[in-house]
Swiss-Prot record:
Name of the featured protein: Poxin-Schlafen
Subunit structure: Homodimer.
Record-annotated active site: H15 (proton donor), Y136 (shared with catalytic histidine of dimeric partner), K140 (proton acceptor)
Any GO molecular function: nuclease activity
Species in which this protein is naturally found: Monkeypox virus
Amino acid sequence: MFYAHAFGGYDENLHAFPGISSTVANDVRKYSVVSVYNKKYNIVKNKYMWCNSQVNKRYIGALLPMFECNEYLQIGDPIHDLEGNQISIVTYRHKNYYALSGIGYESLDLCLEGVGIHHHVLETGNAVYGKVQHEYSTIKEKAKEMNALKPGPIIDYHVWIGDCVCQVTTVDVHGKEIMRMRFKRGAVLPIPNLVKVKVGEENDTINLSTSISALLNSGGGTIEVTSKEERVDYVLMKRLESIHHLWSVVYDHLNVVNGEERCYVHMHSSHQSPMLSTVKTNLYMKTMGACLQMDSMEALEYLSELKESGGRSPRPELQKFEYPDGVKDTESIERLAEEFFNRSELQAGESVKFGNSINVKHTSVSAKQLRTRIRQQLPSILSSFANTKGGYLFIGVDNNTHKVIGFTVGHDYLKLVESDIEKYIQKLPVVHFCKKKEDIKYACRFIKVYKPGDETTSTYVCAIKVERCCCAVFADWPESWYMDTSGSMKKYSPDEWVSHIKF
């Protein structure tokens, strides 16, 4: 068994290596090829990664083999040999390289009581003395100068990682070098998941939410928080209270450390939660009165049903049936909406015989705001219809009085509106669980609205009909992020987001 230190898995009773505790002491130097999720990766020759854990005031560092992988792997993902035996788990990465943790090459195991440890990239051509690096002549003069001082107790260790050689130096309080170890191997340092956020500024809550989501979905990391205001800790805690839904009390761990001018939010996730940390799912459902965005657990339930059923079949056509006056059930409203949708013309001020329902939404807007409102509202409204039972959107019918108002535009502007609608519908992401993988089916009409006595008109009601979709329709990509191999935050696509759900 292997337990990631990033997830709180350190156990002093088990074998400990950089990044993991395990029930077996596996010599990872003997492997030339490894497998992750049945994909094979070659161990990089003559190049290593210096990895370390700092747990319970103990430092565990070593040069480890690494393999190249252009896909994003999660901390804790199992690593196997070619016979299918698990030999380690994913722990550290540098760009598109991942470490293979276990018994590695040169190592350093320290008690950190009273001493510090620092890591540096050793620049090509530089020499090292104690805690500084520079060109050789400068370092030589530095060493001569410090030799005159008496050595004192060691207070710091410095690990220097270079392309051709690695070194460990120790220094006393004056910076005098007390000890040096030299490893004739080239290595790299893993990229830490570190994000910097300023609070007390515009969009600070959004930036903080994005950072938390990305780090929790990438095994953990640290957010360095600064603020123009004096009480950075107070401002931070207020922001964290407003977005507490982003982390799970059961699965995620979050710790705030206060500094003088900044705070640090350390976090890691056990990856046992069925869902990724998500700010917004952008999955909508239609209710009688509104288009509601599903939260993560509602989305899990909805997507689980689609996965289990392999998608949905088209809805059967409505049966013809004469309803007595005044009946307002869902089917009668839908039938009236269908008749209204097929009208060739309308009269300004006429009353519509049906209101909003699970299948119908009315909205009115001025011609000036028409394209803006379509851009802002169309994706959520139409995707909610597609995810529920299908439905009708009528733009130009007053939501309160249910009277026809319309909007007045020229022919060229109408073409732009029609093009906008087509563009926004075609951009709606669909995640399929079925074999047919059909597109969203819809129809759009502009129904002319006449005033009494007018023979011509430039006033219209826009009528859009959307059928129930076979699978899940998103209004946009989910607002859920991860740290990529370059250390940048990337948003999951809908397909990627769904693929990470533990159904």
